[in-house]
Structures are given as C-alpha cells and as structure tokens.
C-alpha cells in the first residue's frame, strides 16, 4: 500500500492539532454506564441519531424520543438549550441537567426506588458556553403519567396511587424532595 502523498498528506499531518483545537472550542462530555458498553457507538453519535431517527413521544420545552438498540427500548431526553447565564454556569460551575438526571437515577435505584435504569448522558458546548444535553435511560415499564390519573379512571388506580405515596414517603425518609409531580411525569 502506498503512503499518502501530495496535498492530502499535508492535511493529515495537521489533523491531530486540528482535533485538539476543535475539542477545546467545542467540548463534549459523554458518559456510558459500564453495564451498557455495547451502546457506546450510539452514545458517541447521539445528537445525529436524535436529529434523524427515533420516534417522538413528547415535544415541548424538552423532547423525548424512543429508540430501539440491541433489543432494548431506550428513551432519550433532549433538554432545551438554557438561557445565556445558565449556559455559562452549566459549562463552568454546575452539572448539566442530563448529568444530574443520570446521577439522580442512580441515587434512586440505590435506595430502592424503582426508576428506569440510566444508560448515559451526552453534553456539548462551545468554548465558554454550554450547548445541548441528552439523557438516555431504558424505557419505563410504567405506562401512566400523572396526567392520566387526572383525566382517566384505571383498574387498580387506588393501588397505583398508594404506591406513588409510598415512593414519596421513601424519598422523604432519605431526605429527598421530589418537587416535580407535573402532569407529564
């Protein structure tokens, strides 16, 4: 095999420097739960997959999409890009919402609160400003949202509501306040 020569050779010799500079200007943080190593390539290209694939299940301030990878159903939440002050804070001082969602899911599972298993998170930015972020988890087995309880009657509804109350009590016993019983959750 012949080595590259000519103009392409000179461009290749700069690629390491270019990539280093690009990572400084456009940082990204990707974390994959070790239990889901096989999803690393999906996580590496998450913004592209999110833009072009998946089934949208909710679109508002944030967007949720359903993906199937490796026989697993995944939920990917894309968070709205924050306003300027928070873009600076998330880039420099505070963990992104995606990273906090991952951490909170791990904490809840440790205290025995059922929550979908977290797969990972992905965050991007540009130099001093935070950009977009994504949180990935397995799909929840629970088919209901709080809105469903307000608008419909279900079989075993009282049992489900009591389970929600027990979960809330468990959270309080561990010093955790839920703070978001909004209808879409």
Model-derived features: where do they sit?
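AlphaC helix of the protein kinase catalytic domain
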Residues: 145-154
């Amino acid at each position: 095999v012949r080595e590259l020569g000519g103009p392409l050779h000179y461009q290749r010799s700069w690629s390491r420097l270019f990539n280093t500079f690009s990572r400084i200007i456009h940082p990204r943080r990707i974390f994959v739960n070790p239990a889901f190593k096989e999803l690393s390539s999906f996580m590496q290209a998450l913004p592209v997959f999110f833009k072009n694939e998946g089934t949208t299940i909710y679109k508002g301030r944030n967007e949720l999409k359903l993906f199937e990878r490796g026989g697993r159903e995944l939920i990917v939440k894309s968070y709205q890009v924050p306003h300027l002050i928070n873009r600076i804070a998330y880039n420099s001082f505070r963990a992104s919402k995606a990273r906090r969602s991952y951490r909170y899911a791990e904490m809840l599972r440790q205290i025995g609160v059922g929550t979908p298993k977290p797969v990972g998170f992905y965050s991007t930015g540009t130099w001093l400003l935070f950009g977009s972020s994504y949180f990935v988890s397995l799909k929840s087995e629970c088919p209901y949202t709080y809105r469903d309880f307000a608008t419909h009657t279900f079989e075993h509804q009282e049992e489900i509501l009591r389970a929600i109350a027990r979960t809330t009590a468990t959270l309080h016993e561990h010093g955790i306040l839920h703070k978001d019983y909004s209808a879409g959750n």
